Amino acid sequence: MNTSSTVIKVTGESAANNYDVVVGRGLLGTLPEILGERVRRVLVIHPRALRLTGDTVRDDLESAGFTALTAEIPDAEEGKHIQVAAFCWQVLGQNDFTRSDAIVAVGGGAVTDLAGFVAATWLRGVKVIHMPTSLLGMVDASVGGKTGINTAEGKNLVGAFHPPAAVLADLDTLDTLPRNELISGMAEVVKCGFIADPAILELVEKDFAAVTDPRSETLRELIERAIAVKAKVVSEDLKESGLREILNYGHTLGHAIELVERYSWRHGAAVSVGMMFAAELARSVGRLSDADADRHRSILEGLGLPVTYRRDRWQGLLDGMRRDKKSRGDLLRFVVLDGVAKPGILDVPDTSLLFAAYQEVAS
């Protein structure tokens, strides 16, 4: 087993926004060194399910001389609400956190989204370090500086761009991750393959079992490749003014499914259906070949991810898609493919086109 660490660099609009994503094993103990000497107080934000891990990180920081506290938040999307952010702000205020102090996020993508938002807004910005413990968190949410919380109107509608000081992707944390969470995270991995790195798709197709084995070198390579794709994109376009939109492949319908399901669906499962829909949409307008569209289905189904959704939910999905951040006026905008690793944008003024494409994924 590879015991060394891989460092993937993310560059920002200035040197102050540059940071490293470290992928390896046994990384939890490196946190004190990364925090540095100026930091005195650290708030460790973690979900209920990771109470023991959060306490371990806190104790390690205390042993290293920091004043460390924990803030336990609800699991998954339930933690991404303004009331939860307000609770974290209260903890920071009551313990006199200053701009030279720091927040550490320990958990999946929802935790890094929430913790990043709290860090971006407390005193207009304090240091945050992400320690993702899920596959989805490692390859997507923790990298790129996007933070956000949900509202009743949609997902991630309130947020800020706030790059982390570092990301520690400790592969040891995947050993106890439930298999369905690994499978969900693979949706974001193969997304990176479809939009930018065909080698990801080839690795998946070669051995479907290995890609969901937390101890396999195949999974590690997939994680590093997916992070590298995202790092390259966000280094060129931090604030989603153009290129970064391609990372939303599958997310327009995916976020709408999450909204309709009141976040009971896993993010990766929703994005999987969203990618299948985007492939059918691109096929219907002649931009994606039959072979590439069918490849979506075979890869996603091979991983155990869903590729269909309920036929009777179309109107709710359409309403949800109209709230998508990529929309411009009355135009719905979709990231589509003109081929593998050839992403583009499709503006759709006529919803009948969307309805027809949806029939190909409706069940």
From Swiss-Prot:
One of its GO terms (cellular component) is cytoplasm. Keywords: Amino-acid biosynthesis, Aromatic amino acid biosynthesis, Cobalt, Cytoplasm, Lyase, Metal-binding, NAD, Nucleotide-binding, Zinc. It catalyses: 7-phospho-2-dehydro-3-deoxy-D-arabino-heptonate = 3-dehydroquinate + phosphate. NAD(+) binds at residues 75-80, 109-113, 133-134, 146, 155, 173-176. Its cofactor is Co(2+); Zn(2+); NAD(+). Binds 1 divalent metal cation per subunit. Can use either Co(2+) or Zn(2+). It is found in: Cytoplasm. One of its GO terms (molecular function) is 3-dehydroquinate synthase activity. One of its GO terms (biological process) is amino acid biosynthetic process. PANTHER family: 3-DEHYDROQUINATE SYNTHASE (PTHR43622), 3-DEHYDROQUINATE SYNTHASE, CHLOROPLASTIC (PTHR43622:SF7). Belongs to the sugar phosphate cyclases superfamily. Dehydroquinate synthase family. This is 3-dehydroquinate synthase. The gene is aroB.
